């Protein structure tokens, strides 16, 4: 009985082994290698450029900004303002009337003789009264917020300058300035522009000692407003400040600072023309979009998925250079750029920049501005001859 069973079992085992041996080749024939996809053809340069220009012109911050302006004009602090959120949590109920004869407004619990602290004023959403002149300024600022590259041509008159400036030095804050000994060269220019209240005391040999115009963004002024003994003019009452607005609520800081100046002859804080803001924003966004496409190979439309598009912004330094292009016959730029062995900022221990800027994109713009300004988008519609721009490293 056992012998008849052994033979069929051996035959069955042989069939199974043969099938197992042939399975990989059968699988390869049935599945086959994955087809090799041909790479996508590169996008036509003219078509890509048109896409970048179109996307750079889109402004996702316009709708929330419009709401913030409306809130202020209706006597409410914008809900998007971090300040408004803090005040709602604190529950302060101090009135603020933005009228010159009522400033400065001091923090609750502080006597005017104790601290010169004019900007720290809690503003409840329910009790905000704007001076009529501030209301007009706010309306005008928002109404002018449109694309008009011709604003560069009109900058000398907009800034109340008697004419163009023969030579300008724009001084950034990079640590590469330390040890560069550019101080005397910087001060030899007819005008020196500085950024975000950077210290010059103790650094004059490398960064110069002269300041004719200070550029800041409104976040810097607002942060100053949170500290005791905040003075609006760190370079002295006679040095004008040009400030671009990051949030509509920061108009309150500007109005407060201007109204509480320690001297009747103090230079005022001027808000940049919003048409210049729009021009700067479009140029930097274009270069950021172009960098994104070149480095990732992805569609330009996907750029916004990697950044907070509504908060994306150019730097104070970029706008300072743009103003210099508009008002100066010759522009020298110092303290822009990074080095592995250099501090981030020459005057502080800050380690990195904010994500809302794209500095690599701005550096690409600077290279084009210095070497081939005719290719810079939007700038070529400004109707001006771009002056010589030299970057010192």
Swiss-Prot record:
Taxonomic superkingdom: Eukaryota
Residues glycosylated per entry: 49, 212, 258
Coiled coil feature spans: none
UniProt keyword terms in alphabetical order: Glycoprotein, Glycosyltransferase, Golgi apparatus, Membrane, Signal-anchor, Transferase, Transmembrane, Transmembrane helix
Localization: Golgi apparatus membrane
EC number: 2.4.99.-
Chief location bin: Golgi
Lumenal side: 28-393
GO biological process terms held by the UniProt record: protein glycosylation
Gene3D superfamilies, per the entry: Glycosyl transferase family 29 (3.90.1480.20)
One Pfam family named in its UniProt record: Glyco_transf_29
Topology feature Cytoplasmic, residues: 1-8
Regions crossing the membrane: 9-27
Record's GO cellular component terms: Golgi membrane
CDD domains: GT29
Molecular function per GO: sialyltransferase activity
Lipid bilayer topology: Single-pass type II membrane protein
Function: Possesses sialyltransferase-like activity in vitro. Transfers sialic acid to the oligosaccharide Gal-beta-1,3-GalNAc and to glycoproteins such as asialofetuin, alpha-1-acid glycoprotein (NeuAc-alpha-2,3-Gal-beta-1,3-GalNAc-) and andasialo-alpha-1-acid glycoprotein. The transferred sialic acid is linked to galactose of Gal-beta-1,3-GalNAc through alpha-2,6-linkage.
Family: Belongs to the glycosyltransferase 29 family.
Protein name per UniProt: Sialyltransferase-like protein 1
Record organism: Oryza sativa subsp. indica (Rice)
Gene it is expressed from: STLP1
